[in-house]
Amino acid sequence: MEQTYQYAWIIPFLPLPVPMLIGVGLLLFPTATKNLRRMWAFTSILLLSIVMIFATNLSIQQINTSSIYQYVWSWTLDNDFSLEFGYLIDPLTSIMSMLITTVGIMVLIYSDNYMAHDQGYLRFFAYMSFFSTSMFGLVTSSNLIQIYIFWELVGMCSYLLIGFWFTRPPAANACQKAFVTNRVGDFGLLLGILGFYWITGSFEFRDLFQIFNNLISNNEVNSPFVTLCAALLFAGAVAKSAQFPLHIWLPDAMEGPTPISALIHAATMVAAGIFLVARLLTLFIVIPYILNIISLIGLITVLLGATLALAQKDIKRGLAYSTMSQLGYMILALGIGSYRSALFHLITHAYSKALLFLGSGSVIHSMETIVGYSPDKSQNMVLMGGLTKHVPITKTSFLLGTLSLSGIPPLACFWSKDEILNDSWLYSPIFAIIAWATAGLTAFYMFRIYLLTFEGHLNCHFQNYSGSQNTSLYSISLWGSTCSQRINKNFHLLRMNNNESSSFFSKKTYRSDQTLRKTNRGRPFINIVHFDTKKPFSYPYESDNTMLFPLLVLVLFTLFVGSIGIPFNQEGTDLDILSKWLAPSINLLHQKSKDSTDWYEFLKDAIFSVSIAYFGIFLASFLYKPIYSSLKNFDFINFFVKTGPKRYRWDKILTVLYDWSYNRAYIDPFYTTCFTGAIRGLAQLTYFFDRRVIDGITNGVGIMSFFLGEGIKYASGGRISSYLFFYFCCVSIFLVIYYKFYLFSLYIPF
């Protein structure tokens, strides 16, 4: 066991050869490197698999022995200062390593097919491997300086991957937005690190915790300053994990490739903020008010993320706001001191969300053959529907991920979310009520995404499905199918021309076969020519096995990973693997783990939470289940759309709520006006001051010198009498000024 821990330092460096060799190969042997590009995908997966075996071994040993291992190298610069760096292997490290490796391997396998026709294939895998290296370095760091270094590297890799298609203005803007937003949090993190070093004189976690606890017990610290430093540390996690108010970068980050979204949202960048708070929870517990701040920010994010997901039409943006809300649950759990519940939900959410994002990538992949390669079309749920019979494997896996995130037993997220809800009730009934209500919203918006995507018929050209020629067309409302508003047949929202198909990578348009279009006019699909093969497609198709295999593996994780945290420790049985795994950290936090759980209490709480989830599912099914497939009688629909003052007020409320949700609660425009506009105004004022005042003074001195020199030049024509006249004039002026000052000093003594 000791040897395994001693060689754990190699974990961050194992994926590193891939980006280095790809870079060298593209510089020295570009043609051969590009021809053998599939080899680099295999190498990336192989090296990450080795790390997974290593991490699995460490995890098993920690479960059996409940041990923590730390190794530190010290570089003494002088007698008063030494630089220490090393690695720390504890339960939190092993959990994060398992998440990064398992999710990362699935994403790499998936990406081999998803990115197969992309010109940036090699660049993609180089970024991914370096991303893994940075994240492994972060989770194995033993001090705050190493944390900050790898924290910045994780952010850099995220920016590179968000802006992977940097030639597209939306991707470039999203990359810039993520960078600027995270700069705010990272600056706070740096100030917090320096503040605690000034207080304790150490960056090492163990020394820092011990010294700080001694200072607190002896009442030798300034509480407001300590609280400020802790809040600055937490600001780094707020930005990285997309918590309110620094959450605005996360939805725009969907401009990157879908596999990147899966990795960022499941196990890397956004998980880094949760990791940081969990790592420093020993410090935060003894600081006044900081846990209250953490729990409040988490609760606001839980509710805000859920409400903003209600009206999104982009499938990836809807999942992004779902991630924001679920991360809020984890921050809330850490803020109320529920360390085990937070990490449990981090594990279960990672696999469920990776499954959902990879499933959405499969859906987008199939829709591109129908609507083209523009993300505004291929990711638009309004244009989807009826994909169940065409992508059944993707549909089933996406449904399981949706059920898990909705909190339906026995899937993974049910166990962890239910534990957070129960712990929040013990902390604050108000917090618990909001958290429970948001659980219902989660089930609602997740099934809204599922129903709009897979149920009904394909909506991309608003086909009349009733069979009659003169039947009214009903709009596919983002609020459900009960809307009775007629749509204009010339409706232009995200619709392609009748005879064109667009490509994501090219500005060219390709004409469809008119004869084939006339032949298939009765089918509920449109025909376009595929970008690469120029082959016409009239229906979506299931993804290749390379993309389906990771989905099936993640389905298994979603089904069974929740079993590691089942809190049933009865006589003769011990099913709570997670508590044994986290025992050293729980002991360090001086928390008592539950020896047993009452079946009656557990079932009572579970029934309540599941009932709320089912209510959200029922409401989503009622609003979004296609009217032409389930409610043949349109009079039943008309029963709910009766006009009148109550209906008018209800529609007005829904419109306001929809606008608020779809426009991201107007937070982005507020930031644009208050911060971006203010900074640009200040920049323009600075520019004006620099050009008119600073440059004016400098240029004015030069111009005055020029005219003075010219005047002197014309005054001195080479005649001695002119020189004498000019000289006596200057002397006279000087004497007059001197005489005036002399008289002034006589009459007004100082």
Swiss-Prot record:
Taxonomic lineage is: Eukaryota, Viridiplantae, Streptophyta, Embryophyta, Tracheophyta
Q: What is this protein called?
A: NAD(P)H-quinone oxidoreductase subunit 5, chloroplastic
Membrane topology of the entry: Multi-pass membrane protein
Taxonomic source organism: Tecoma stans
Identify which top EC class this enzyme belongs to.
translocase
Q: What is its EC number?
A: 7.1.1.-
Q: What does this protein do?
A: NDH shuttles electrons from NAD(P)H:plastoquinone, via FMN and iron-sulfur (Fe-S) centers, to quinones in the photosynthetic chain and possibly in a chloroplast respiratory chain. The immediate electron acceptor for the enzyme in this species is believed to be plastoquinone. Couples the redox reaction to proton translocation, and thus conserves the redox energy in a proton gradient.
Self-association and partners: NDH is composed of at least 16 different subunits, 5 of which are encoded in the nucleus.
Similarity comment: Belongs to the complex I subunit 5 family.
